[in-house]
Amino acid sequence: MKLKKRMGGESLFDTFNKGDVVMAFFPCTRFEVQILLWFRGEAMQQKNWSEADKLEYCMKLHDELHRNYMLISKMVIVLQKRGIPVIIENPYSTQHYLTNYWCIKPKVIDKDRHATGDYMKKPTQYWFIGIEPKDNLIMEQVNYKKRLSVSNLFGTKDYVVQRSMISKDYVNRFIREFIVDGEPKPIEEEKTLFDYEV
């Protein structure tokens, strides 16, 4: 498959260089397990829909799923051709679309993010493409947070944002455990991932 020069124009990826690492939080709404309920016509919101309404909506969802699948695959192809490693984050479940229908397998699966300093359990998978995850041992106490669940947040003003938030402590540990070379030391507050050599 030959990709056009990013649809004939400039690309975000033109600004990346070898030595950079892309961390992609790719939209999950069409890959995650809840989409299966919609495809089967069993989502609560579809309770009073006609079969024709369900089919029309499912065709629209399938187009969106296909679009996202093409985008994530094209992104990886472009980055691989440029020699730029990428780490992709998405929810984990055995029914997740990419888990079952993508030729690249995740290299890190975190089944309980709360255990390593996040606000929620949220099982998450990470694809390390063009880079191998490190296996650094972090010998320090986890800064546990009050555990939240999506159901606790439902109906709040910023529900959509809050359910996607990741705590600084979780990110700090993840970077030091899986991305940064050498002896892992706590990352200082004013530094970011961009301040570290990979």
Sequence positions of predicted segments:
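Conserved active-site and SAM-binding loop architecture
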Residues: 1-197
